[in-house]
């Protein structure tokens, strides 16, 4: 008998029929989604892709950096707790290379607040989503993050 892992992603039947989408017909913002649980990274990337974003999953910090160098992201969405390089370390590294990249962190871990406080003391401010990540919350935060960074795309 094998145990099924519990993934902190909302069941598809709980996803509203109408989700916020990227309304720009010309511009598909590149979003890099990172989680060591491939089902979560893949699901979030798929939600974003279906909503009009060019989303790519990665499963650890090193892979995310390699992917970012090939396709510079406008937004990084990463789990805080990754093996090896933490999501916060990844976010700082990505911003060193791509200073205009926006960052959304997500976590279901209580220890995250200590890591965020440490990053803030070092001058890094990040937005945090908590697991489970609901599609409507994800898309709202993505839209808000990209609106701030791209005022020229507003109608």
Task: Annotate each PLM feature.
Residues 1-30, 136-155:
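Non-catalytic signal-transmission and effector/linker regions of two-component phosphorelay proteins
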Residues 41, 83:
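The feature encodes the CheY-like receiver
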Residues 42-50:
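Charged docking surfaces used in two-component/phosphorelay signaling
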Residues 52-59, 67, 129:
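Short hydrophobic/Thr-rich beta-strand motif most characteristic of the beta2 strand and flanking loop
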Residues 60-63, 86-89, 107:
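Acidic catalytic/metal-coordinating carboxylates
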Residues 66, 88-99:
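Short amphipathic alpha-helix used as the core "switch/output" element in two-component signaling
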Residues 71-77, 82:
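Active-site beta3 strand of CheY-like receiver
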Residues 89, 102, 110-130, 136-144:
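Alpha4 helix (beta4-alpha4-beta5 surface) of REC/receiver domains from two-component response regulators
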């Amino acid at each position: 008998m094998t145990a099924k892992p519990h993934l902190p992603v909302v069941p598809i039947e709980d996803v509203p029929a109408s989700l916020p989408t990227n309304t720009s017909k010309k511009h598909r913002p590149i979003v890099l989604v990172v989680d060591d649980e491939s089902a979560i990274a893949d699901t979030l990337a798929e939600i974003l892709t279906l909503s009009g974003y060019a989303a790519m999953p990665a499963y650890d910090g090193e892979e995310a950096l390699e992917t970012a160098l090939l396709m510079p992201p406008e937004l990084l969405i990463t789990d805080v707790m990754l093996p090896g390089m933490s999501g916060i370390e990844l976010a700082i590294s990505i911003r060193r290379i791509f200073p205009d990249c926006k960052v959304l962190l997500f976590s279901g871990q209580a220890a995250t607040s200590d890591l965020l406080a440490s990053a803030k003391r070092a001058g890094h401010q990040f937005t945090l989503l908590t697991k489970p990540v609901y599609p409507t919350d994800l898309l709202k935060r993505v839209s808000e993050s990209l609106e701030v960074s791209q005022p020229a795309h507003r109608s």
